[in-house]
C-alpha cells in the first residue's frame, strides 16, 4: 500500500519563535492561518530592506493520526524550507535540514500518537548563513524565507522500496559489452530483528510498452 496526503492546508504561523512553541499544549489559536506554499514575510514591490524577511519564525500543524496508520510507515516530506529548519513532533525534536533548495523527509512512524491529535512544529531560520548556499558570494535575487514549497505525508507498508537506481556501465575502449545495473534500497520500519524474504522482479519496456528484458532476481 502507498498513499500520499498533501499537507498544504491547516498551518498556523508566527513571525517569532520561542522554545515553548514546540510543546503540544502551547496555545496557537491566535496565530495566523496560512496555506503552503508560504513566505514568512509579505514585501512591497519596491523600497524595502532585505532584512525584513530574515527572521526566526514558527509553523505549527495539528493533525489526527488514525488507527490505520498503526502498522504503516508514515513519512513527512517538505519540498523546500528556506533556509534552516528544525522539526518537532509533540515537543520532541525529530529532524533538521540546512538548505532552502532541496527537499527532505522524516520518518515519524514510531513517534506518532495513534488515535490522538499530534502537533508538528517547524522552526524556520531565514537569515543569511555563509555556510548554506546560495549565501557566501554575490547573488542577484531575493532569498525569501518560510515553507515556500509543498509538504505531504506518504503512507507505506512497514517494509517498502525506499529507492531504485538504474544505470548502465559500458567499458571504455573495449568491445561493446554494456551492463545494466539495478540498485535497490529496501527499508523496514517495523521490528528491526524480524527477518523477511523478498522477491523483486524488474522488467524493461519501450515507450510502446513492448517487453524487452526481465532482470534476474540475483
Q: What do the PLM-derived regions correspond to, one by one?
A:
Residues 9, 87-89, 197-208:
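Extended low-complexity, serine/threonine- and proline-enriched intrinsically disordered segments
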Amino acid at each position: 500500500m502507498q498513499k500520499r496526503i498533501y499537507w498544504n492546508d491547516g498551518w498556523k504561523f508566527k513571525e517569532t519563535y520561542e522554545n515553548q512553541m514546540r510543546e503540544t499544549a502551547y496555545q496557537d489559536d491566535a496565530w495566523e492561518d496560512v496555506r503552503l506554499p508560504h513566505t514568512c514575510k509579505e514585501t512591497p514591490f519596491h523600497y524595502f530592506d532585505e532584512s525584513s524577511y530574515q527572521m526566526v519564525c514558527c509553523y505549527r500543524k495539528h493533525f489526527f493520526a488514525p488507527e490505520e496508520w498503526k502498522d504503516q510507515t508514515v513519512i513527512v516530506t517538505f519540498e523546500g524550507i528556506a533556509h534552516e529548519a528544525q522539526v518537532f513532533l509533540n515537543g520532541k525534536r525529530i529532524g533538521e535540514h540546512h538548505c532552502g533548495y532541496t527537499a527532505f523527509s522524516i520518518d515519524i512512524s514510531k513517534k506518532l500518537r495513534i488515535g490522538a491529535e499530534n502537533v508538528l512544529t517547524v522552526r524556520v531560520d531565514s537569515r543569511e548563513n555563509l555556510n548554506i548556499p546560495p549565501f557566501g558570494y554575490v547573488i542577484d535575487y531575493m532569498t525569501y524565507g518560510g515553507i515556500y514549497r509543498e509538504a505531504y505525508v506518504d503512507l507505506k507498508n512497514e517494509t517498502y522500496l525506499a529507492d531504485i537506481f538504474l544505470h548502465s556501465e559500458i567499458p571504455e575502449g573495449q568491445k561493446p559489452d554494456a551492463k545494466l545495473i539495478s540498485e535497490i534500497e529496501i527499508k523496514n520500519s517495523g521490528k528491526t530483528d524480524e527477518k523477511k524474504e523478498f522477491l523483486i522482479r524488474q522488467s524493461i519496456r519501450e515507450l510502446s510498452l513492448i517487453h524487452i528484458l526481465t532482470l534476474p532476481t540475483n
